[in-house]
Amino acid sequence: MHLVGVLDIAKDILKANKRLADKNRKLLNKHGVVAFDFMGAIGSGKTLLIEKLIDNLKDKYKIACIAGDVIAKFDAERMEKHGAKVVPLNTGKECHLDAHLVGHALEDLNLDEIDLLFIENVGNLICPADFDLGTHKRIVVISTTEGDDTIEKHPGIMKTADLIVINKIDLADAVGADIKKMENDAKRINPDAEVVLLSLKTMEGFDKVLEFIEKSVKEVK
């Protein structure tokens, strides 16, 4: 197949996904649900961050999660233990969630009984960037253990983020990561995104993530 044909197919796929994403967002708005798409590589700390958010927000908000994984229900089972309603989504060989899959997951949730929806995307820093799920905010989680050049190597996904979380700052010295460089890279690539330096071991910076969630709720509602 010629390159032009391949590009046309890709454009059609993204266009169809955008229509479904807008449909998902309209449905969430109708029911007053504020949704967040958590993106990041495997091991960046997405699941643990979501668990901590559930623990700290569940007394104030009714929370549900959609957990994307290539196989099994590992992350979904972890989140359920923290008291959230969780819908697992297995993507098989696909490296990202899409609006079609999320739309089906929404059918398994009673949206009238949900205030916040946390969607954990498949662990990947490339594919998820192009596929709007219908969420209101996108959060990208990067860890110092991935290397301090990870942010500048993945500008595409960084440009889509509303919040960039630089996680595992407590391990920066051990792995030789320059936190300031990572922070500067994030701000240079996406000046509009908020940037938070985080350690889920010491909980440094976690209050700023909570503030972002709370502020987002006020913006959307």
Swiss-Prot record:
Record-annotated residues binding Ni(2+)?
95-96, 127
Identify the InterPro entries for this entry: CobW/HypB/UreG_nucleotide-bd (IPR003495), Hyd_mat_HypB (IPR004392), P-loop_NTPase (IPR027417)
GO molecular function annotation:
GTP binding; GTPase activity; nickel cation binding; zinc ion binding
Q: What is this protein identified as?
A: Probable hydrogenase maturation factor HypB
Ordered alphabetically, the record's keywords are: GTP-binding, Hydrolase, Metal-binding, Nickel, Nucleotide-binding, Zinc
Functionally, this protein is described as follows: Involved in the maturation of [NiFe] hydrogenases. Required for nickel insertion into the metal center of the hydrogenase. Exhibits a low intrinsic GTPase activity, which is essential for nickel insertion.
Binding positions for Zn(2+) 1 per the UniProt entry: 95-96, 127
The record's Gene3D superfamilies line, in alphabetical order, gives: P-loop containing nucleotide triphosphate hydrolases
The annotated subunit structure for this chain is:
Homodimer.
Organism phylogeny: Archaea, Methanobacteriati, Methanobacteriota, Methanomada group, Methanococci
Q: Does the keyword Nucleotide-binding apply?
A: yes
Annotated family: Belongs to the SIMIBI class G3E GTPase family. HypB/HupM subfamily.
Region named G-domain: 35-196
* Binding annotation for Zn(2+) 2: 100, 104
Any single GO BP term: protein maturation
> Pfam family of this protein, just one?
cobW
Domain of life where this protein originates:
Archaea
